[in-house]
A protein has these predicted regions:
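N-terminal pre-catalytic "stem/leader" segment of glycosyltransferase-like enzymes
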Residues: 1-73
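Active-site proximal beta-strand in glycosyltransferases
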Residues: 67-69, 82-102
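Alpha-helix capping/helix-boundary segments
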Residues: 75, 132-134
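Proline-centered loop/turn at the N-terminus of a beta-strand
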Residues: 91-93, 125, 147, 172
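Carbohydrate-associated surface elements
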Residues: 132, 151-154
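Conserved donor-binding/catalytic core segment of Leloir-type glycosyltransferases
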Residues: 166-176
């Protein structure tokens, strides 16, 4: 499993280097062209669904992109790729959902936070999922010097609706 993940990280990082060699300066500034840094998509799980929906509005561009959108729990670029993005002035937007804890993740949680911390601190802008997410990020990853804001996750109001209250008088029938 680790071999496959490491290979995937290497491939995505290689794509960043290739982009910087052949597409530097070719990025159109009047159009948003995003690279999602290898983040996966799917139907179950917040990150997978978030990227799937974002790709419907902003397709994934492996080359010629002018912005990179990374997620705290999708660490699919290595340090060299992230440094390359910074060197080539490609903005990094980082979505910070949470951090790793010993009680939740177990052994290796500190190393995972260390990896996350690198892209978190080099990002040009950070979206925090909540005040709690920002607090934990500052505690476990360190205080950021860059820009950011709290952007709460959206709720589908067509699916999640308030339950209609039933008034006791309208439903109660007494049989004699």
């Amino acid at each position: 499993k680790n071999f496959v993940i490491n290979l995937y990280i290497l491939i995505n990082s290689f794509l960043v280097i290739v982009n910087s060699l052949f597409y530097r300066g070719n990025q159109k500034k009047d159009q948003i062209k995003i690279f999602y840094g290898g983040s996966l998509t799917g139907n179950i799980g917040g990150t997978l669904v978030k990227i799937k929906r974002l790709k419907k509005k902003f397709k994934n561009n492996y080359f010629g992109y002018n912005c990179v959108y990374l997620l705290s729990n999708s660490l699919y670029l290595n340090k060299y790729a992230i440094q390359n993005l910074k060197k080539n002035n490609i903005p990094i937007i980082h979505n910070q959902n949470g951090v790793y804890y010993k009680g939740w993740y177990g052994e290796g949680w500190e190393e995972k936070n260390k990896l996350m911390s690198f892209q978190y601190h080099l990002a040009d802008y950070v979206f925090y999922q909540s005040n709690f997410s920002k607090y934990c990020s500052e505690k476990f990853l360190g205080k950021r010097e860059g820009s950011g804001e709290i952007l709460y996750n959206a709720v589908d109001n067509d699916f999640f609706k308030p339950y209609k209250k039933k008034l006791l008088g309208t439903e109660l029938k007494i049989l004699v």
